[in-house]
Amino acid sequence: LAGVMGLLGDKGEKHLFGNQFSQFVKGSTELKYYRRLWGDNWLASRFLVGAGHAYGNSKVMPYSEQFYIGGANSIRAFTIRTLGPGSYRPPQDNPNAYFDQTGDFKLEANIEFRFKIIGDLHGAIFMDAGNIWLLKEDPQRPGGKLTLKSFGKDIALGTGFGLRYDISYIVLRADLGIGLHTPYPNPDKKGYYNLSSFKNSLGFHLAIGY
């Protein structure tokens, strides 16, 4: 659409029915691998990478198209939209802070050992890692840009365990995540484990499906 308008000589802001529209490209890919170890015991792994770039009319992608991380289907030690971008951490006294915790680039990995307990009840031990980043510097969100220098420290890490009840056509899932490392610095913690307390490192989630 923007290309057609360019051919027609419209070199300024692009509009559709009188409204300016967003211009961006976005893509993501997800890889999953399952391996039966023995009996009803499985090793399941997942890797996801996604990126987006705004251009033309837009300086940023629409909010609904930006990446976020955390929650029942992500890094389970952290609730949804409480990580990133990068090492940025919004003011904790701002109830709307989670609006700022989105990014242009997402990297996430999960590995899970699934085992049968009894009947249709299964258990799982898992580890999750990842974060989101900005591809452009944002003065309002310092530390949010993806850089090679801070990449390792920016990766959030969590572990945990859960229960799965398999009713043949649906799986009910409960997970308790335990945070091991957050991307934002904690002046009271010097080592890799930098959660303020064990209680604050916990995340509980209920979900349907794997």
Give a label for each model feature.
Residues 5-8, 138-156, 187-197:
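Outer-membrane beta-barrel domain signature, especially the mid-to-C-terminal portions
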Residues 128-130, 135, 160, 164, ...:
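Flexible, small/polar- and glycine-enriched "cap/hinge" segments at structural transition points
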Residues 1-115, 126-145:
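C-terminal outer-membrane beta-barrel translocator/porin domains of Gram-negative envelope proteins
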